[in-house]
Amino acid sequence: MKRFPMFLRTAAALALAASLAGCGAMNAQNPSSALQPVNAVPDETDSRLFLKGADVVAYFTQKQYVQGSPQFKSSHEGVTFRFASAANKALFDQAPASYLPQYGGYCANGIAYGIPWGGDADTWKMIDGKLYIFGGQASREAFELDVAGNLRLAEKYWAEEVKGSNSFWQRSKRLVFKVPHYKTGEELAAQVAAAKARP
């Protein structure tokens, strides 16, 4: 019997490990609910923790990112939300939809490209009373180059492709089959730098 070369066995083992390592996150981000897909991760106590435990109410009431506590949490559509206080939990429980970030808490700039990238809870923006999360400062700045245009694109791709889909497969599809307006991170960074350089 012919043996597989070492590099093939190593590659197969790495592929298997990578696929198994992603199962927890893949399951957490794709609950069987109206929130699918959602920016959630498993942790020690919760299998689908939204935005790594950021208090979604605090963005509206305190106008800042605040980390929630496991002491104050609610479940909505199969996803766990944490809050910094009992008061914030009560506000959420009265009207959860009022406090949910757009696009399941994924990076709004990524959604404009049809790609559900994880959002960074401390990089956010309120636009017309709605909460948008971004993957980092560079992503937010790129989105702000054309807020109206990027919102139109994000709404289109969220409605037509991302909402209700499996985040992993959608991300994989759009990383291979890019949208017509796709720009690399370097191209976006150059546009942001040029915009900042203008008087």
Q: What would you call each of these model-derived segments?
A:
Residues 78-85:
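Short, well-structured hydrophobic secondary-structure segments
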Residues 16:
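Structured alpha-helical
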Residues 85-100:
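Short, solvent-exposed recognition patches
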Residues 2-12:
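Bacterial N-terminal signal peptides that target proteins for export
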Residues 24-77, 98-199:
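Intrinsically disordered, low-complexity terminal tails and linkers in eukaryotic proteins, enriched
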Residues 19-22:
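C-terminal motif of bacterial Sec signal peptides marking the signal peptidase cleavage site
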